[in-house]
Amino acid sequence: MVADLGGWPMVEGSRWLEDRTGTWWQLSSKLRQLGLSPNYIVDVSVASDLRDSSRRVISLDQPSLGLAREQLMQGRDHPTIRAAAKYMIDIARMLGADQRTVREEVDKVMDFHIKLASITQTREERRDTSLLYNPMTISEISRLNPDTPWLEYINSLLEGMRVNGNERVVVHAPDFVEKLNALLRETPDRVQVS
């Protein structure tokens, strides 16, 4: 399955080609087509509208981090973060990663996770649900975060339907979406898809 998705950069090493895997959002789309729910960079779903339960609406939220935000914010030296990095190294080695470079690759991925956590809202900031209801069109989201092709990405996730730039999306964390643009711009694709 990993090979079908274009390979894992930390296993493929210098043989990894971006055009086989694509960007984070293209990989996310491929994973969704396989029945998985990839929400490691953003969480896109269709759910009941919180203000009108008779309607369904596309929802865009910050990701479910694989590790607790509080632990990630303490950096790579936190015991849980070290354990997660060791686990990632062990899996990559079992799949054939280069022993000399895998640690550096994992460090970059963990640093990305830490930076991603730093732009998410805390649990306390998310307690006021009225602040989590920010209807925007896909075109407006694209202005907040212009480097991600939001219309193409959202359409790739929707089975059997297509939307346009005027489609209303409930954005739960607009600040996150905006800050994500800068983070993705500074992070190599091979780190984003790892």
Regions found by a protein language model. Give the residues of each.
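Noncatalytic, helix-rich "gating/capping" subdomain that lines the substrate-entry/channel surface
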Residues: 1-194
